[in-house]
Amino acid sequence: MQEFSHIKDDRAYMVDISNKDTVVRYATASGKIKLHDETVEKIRSGDVEKGNVLATARTAAILAVKRTPDLIPMCHQIPITSVDVEFEIGKSDVTANVEVKSVGRTGVEMEALTGVSVALLTIWDMVKSAEKDNTGNYPSTAIENIHVIRKVKETITNQ
């Protein structure tokens, strides 16, 4: 069985990354929110009462990436050099893709996953009035398949 690097003697701790090489790191994560067709059309046409859903979700994702160490206890504060947030609008869903780049000593996959999660939660928050049923619940709204698409580590070469 593989050992967890952040657990020692049944106690969680932050892994020491000070001896790791500084390299360029990328991670891309993706996830989807399922919505009513009518809600997706309102997002597409810009007809959501709370405002521009995707612009707000993009901003929320970027802020979430930068705040990941405040939310996930064992994440290191690392220099984020780039965040790119893209959305794909389907018939009854919206997919969020977040790519994070850093030059540092540890990966950025948790930052990318956090960005996707908060983007999708923001979309839900902005359209929840259109998604509720007559009891105030969300029987068909769902966030799904949040996962890392790719993680890359590149050696820095002096030019």
UniProtKB/Swiss-Prot annotation:
SUPFAM superfamilies, per the entry: Molybdenum cofactor biosynthesis protein C, MoaC
Q: Name one Pfam family in it.
A: MoaC
Describe the task this protein carries out. Answer: Catalyzes the conversion of (8S)-3',8-cyclo-7,8-dihydroguanosine 5'-triphosphate to cyclic pyranopterin monophosphate (cPMP).
| Protein name, as recorded | Probable cyclic pyranopterin monophosphate synthase
As recorded in UniProt, its EC number(s) are 4.6.1.17
Could you tell me which species this protein originates from? Methanococcoides burtonii (strain DSM 6242 / NBRC 107633 / OCM 468 / ACE-M)
Instruction: Provide one Gene Ontology biological process annotation.
Output: Mo-molybdopterin cofactor biosynthetic process
Q: Which gene encodes it?
A: moaC
Task: Give the catalytic activity.
Answer: (8S)-3',8-cyclo-7,8-dihydroguanosine 5'-triphosphate = cyclic pyranopterin phosphate + diphosphate
Query: Looking at the keywords, is Calcium present?
Result: no
Residues binding substrate: M74, C75, H76, M110, E111
Q: Active site at which residues?
A: D125
CDD domains for the chain: MoaC_A (cd01419)
Q: What is known about its subunit structure?
A: Homohexamer; trimer of dimers.
